[in-house]
Structure formats: C-alpha cells, structure tokens
C-alpha cells in the first residue's frame, strides 16, 4: 500500500483525480480522504486499482481529441457514475467492478475514434440506435466492431477475464442471459448494471430508452434484484447531479 501510494503521489494529476472521485457523493464515504494513503486505506487495494485503471483510460484517450471523444467521455463517465448508484440497490455487484466495467464497456469506440477519420459519421448515423445496429454498421465498414476492439484493449490491460468477456458480449445480451457456452465467461450482473446505467443516463438527459432495454429489461432487473420502480429513484438520485465546477 505504501509503495502504491508513493507511486501515485508522484503524479499530481492522477492523485488529484483519485481524491476528487473518492470524495464525491457517489462513493458515499462517511469520512473524506485527505491524501492518497487515506484513500487506499478507506477503499482498499482492489477498489483503488480499478479506479486508477479507469483514470488511466482517460489519459490514454484524452478529451481534447475532438468533439466525438468529448461526447464519448461525457456519456461513459455519466454511465460509470450511474453504475455506482445502481450497485447501492442491486445484489451481488461490487461497486468498483461495476464502475470499471461500465467505464470500459465502450472503450473500443475510443480506439476507433482515434483510428478512423470517418468513424464519426457512422456514430452520428446511429445516434438513436447506439447498440447492435451500430455494431453491425461497424462490422460492415471495418470488419470488426467496438465490442471486439474493447475486448482486445481490456485484455491488453490485463483486466479480469470476466470483465473482458462481458465487454466483448455487451451487445449479445441474449447469449449472456441464457448462459450459452460462448457466453460462459461473461458476468450477467455486470452486463445488467451497464445496461441499466445507460438507461438512467438517457432518461436523465430526456432521451428515449434503447431497444436493448426494451428487449432485455426483465433480464436486467431480475439479475440485479431491482424493482421497476427503483429506476425512478435512480434517475432522481441527487448524487448523479453535476457538482459545481464539473463538466
């Protein structure tokens, strides 16, 4: 712990980002962390490691790469924050795992934004159908989709296998829900958290629910042990309101 705290302390930007995240209302800590050693002591090694991984992802694909990357990060960050709120109501889902998975779920899109100049046009054309329809369009244009790219990135970063496979299959919900052999390594609870968190973000933005939610709402709610009425509670959660100076 002391060695990790010392390493983090050498990167002022990373240390500040960790403290800001840990002390946010989303984590609901009874006492605030004043420094990195305290943050590690309060959250534990695994939770801090997952948090750092997410922050490093942001450094790898900076917001300044353009408006589509800005939008990608806005949506991904809000979804990851909503995932933390979901875990407070759900059963059997770790807060840090849910946050990391939801932040990385669409990380393949960040790679494709930086790699393909025409990718923005494909995303815009499927703005109202951001799920399987977008993946099919990606497959037709590039011969792979963002889920496969995200899986490769997550494995390259040595994230847990269950998380990697859930990223790979996050648009193959029926496979995961029915526990097919191909989906055996994926985590249904993580998949459900990401799906619900996405809907919470959309509803808070005044957008319609996705087709994936309409098709798989029952799976998500049953897997998490959440009643439909709880979605309203999540949408209205004060902890998800932007903090002063955020953006």
Role assignments for model-derived ranges:
Residues 1-120, 124-214, 240:
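Conserved alpha-helical "signature site"
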């Amino acid at each position: 712990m002391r060695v990790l705290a010392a390493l983090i302390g050498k990167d002022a930007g990373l240390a500040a980002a960790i403290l800001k995240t840990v002390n946010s209302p989303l984590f609901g800590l009874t006492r605030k962390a004043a420094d990195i050693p305290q943050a590690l002591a309060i959250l534990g090694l695994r939770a801090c490691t997952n948090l750092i991984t997410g922050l490093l992802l942001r450094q790898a694909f900076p917001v300044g790469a353009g408006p589509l990357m800005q939008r990608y990060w806005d949506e991904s960050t809000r979804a990851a924050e909503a995932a933390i709120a979901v875990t407070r109501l759900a059963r059997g889902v770790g807060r840090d795992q849910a946050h990391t998975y939801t932040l990385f779920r669409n990380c393949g899109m960040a790679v494709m934004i930086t790699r393909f100049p025409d990718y923005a046009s494909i995303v815009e054309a499927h703005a109202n159908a951001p799920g399987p329809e977008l993946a099919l369009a990606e497959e037709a244009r590039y011969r792979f989709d963002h889920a496969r790219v995200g899986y490769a990135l997550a494995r390259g970063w040595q994230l847990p296998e269950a998380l990697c496979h859930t990223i790979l299959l996050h648009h193959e919900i029926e496979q995961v829900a029915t526990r097919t052999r191909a989906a055996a390594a994926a985590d249904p609870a993580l998949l459900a958290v990401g799906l619900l968190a996405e809907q919470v973000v959309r509803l808070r933005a005044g957008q319609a629910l996705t087709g994936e939610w309409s098709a798989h709402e029952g799976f998500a709610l049953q897997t998490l042990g959440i009643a439909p009425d709880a979605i309203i509670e999540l949408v209205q959660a004060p902890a998800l309101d932007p903090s002063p100076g955020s953006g």
